[in-house]
Amino acid sequence: MEPFAKALEIVARVMRDGAATHPDNDWVQRGPEYHLGRAEEHLRLRRDGDQLQDHVSHAATRLLMALTLRELG
């Protein structure tokens, strides 16, 4: 876990911040494909030079959401 410790802290922060604007863990009501699409959008925005958010952190969070939902079945 050591190499990923800082990255996981950042993902946890994104989740905490998201909980303030998206109550009730509403992300679990979406399917994995939705979160994959949102991750792709964050990566596209980063490639296009957008700096309004930390798009890599948000993309990583969305990928972990998709993985979690896939594993929960």
Q: What does each model-identified segment do?
A:
Residues 1-73:
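Intrinsically disordered, low-complexity regulatory regions
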